[in-house]
Amino acid sequence: MTSSLVGSEMCIRDRYLADTGLPKERTYMTGSPMAEVLRGNLDKIQASDVLERIGLEKDKYILLSAHREENIDTEKNFTSLFTAINALAEKYDMPILYSCHPRSKHRLEKSGFKLDPRVRVNEPLGFNDYNCLQMNALAIVSDSGTLPEESSFYLSIGHPIAAVCIRTSTERPEALEAGDFILAGITTKELLNATDMAIEMKQKGVLGKPCPDYVDETVSMKVVRIIQGYVNVVNKMVWRKDQ
C-alpha cells in the first residue's frame, strides 16, 4: 500500500501506474507534500540572510544544482553539462552559485575539469537558504527532482521563478505541461536557449499555471486518513491476515 500511495502523486498517474500493474482499487491520489513543507517554512525562507552572507544581489546571479547520477557519473554527460555551464557563465557574465554535493565536488576534482571563474562552488546549502536563493535568482538551473514542484508552488503564491531543468526527461510531466519549468537538456545550445527563454518569459509575465497536485496543502492529512481507513482492507486483501 505504501508504495502505491507515495507513487500516486502525479496528475497523469493513471496511465503510468496502470503500466506497472498496480491495482486501481489500492492506488490513491494524494498530491505532493512539497507545498506544505514550503508553506510551513516560507517565513524562514524569506527571512534568510543568505544573499548578504555570500555576497549576492537579487536577480544578479544564477543558481545551479547538478548532482544526479546521469549528469555526474557518465563522462559524456558530465563534460557536456559543465561545458554548457561555462558557456552560461560567459554569456550572462554574472556569478553562478553552485550548491555542490560532496559526490559532485569529488567528481569535479577528480576529472580536473576547469570551471569558469564565475561559477562559484559552494558547500551544500540548507533548505531555507537554498529556497531563498531560488526566490531571488535570475534563473535556477537544476537537475533536482523537486524543481517542478517548487516552481509550481512559487507561481501559486505570485512569485514565479525562471526554472530550467538540466535533464533529458522528467518524472513531473504534468508540471511540464502546465508550463512551470523548461526541460533543457544538457548541451550548450539547449541550455542557453532554455535559460534565455525562461528569463524572458518571467520578465514579460508569460507564465504557466500552478499544477494542482503541487500546490495542495492537505496532503499529509489525506495520507494519514487513507492509511487509517484502509489498514484492515490491506491486511485482509494484501497480507491475508485474519481480522
Task: Name these PLM-found stretches.
Residues 45-136, 241:
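Donor-nucleotide binding loops and adjacent catalytic segments primarily
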Residues 1-7, 12:
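Single conserved hydrophobic/aromatic residue that forms the stacking wall/gate
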Residues 130-175:
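A donor-sugar binding/catalytic signature common to diverse glycosyltransferases
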Residues 15-33, 38:
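Helix-loop-beta element that forms the nucleotide-linked donor phosphate-binding surface
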Residues 28-29, 120-124, 182-187:
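Short acidic-hydrophobic, aromatic-tinged amphipathic segments that line or gate anion-handling sites
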Residues 200-243:
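C-terminal amphipathic helix plus adjacent low-complexity
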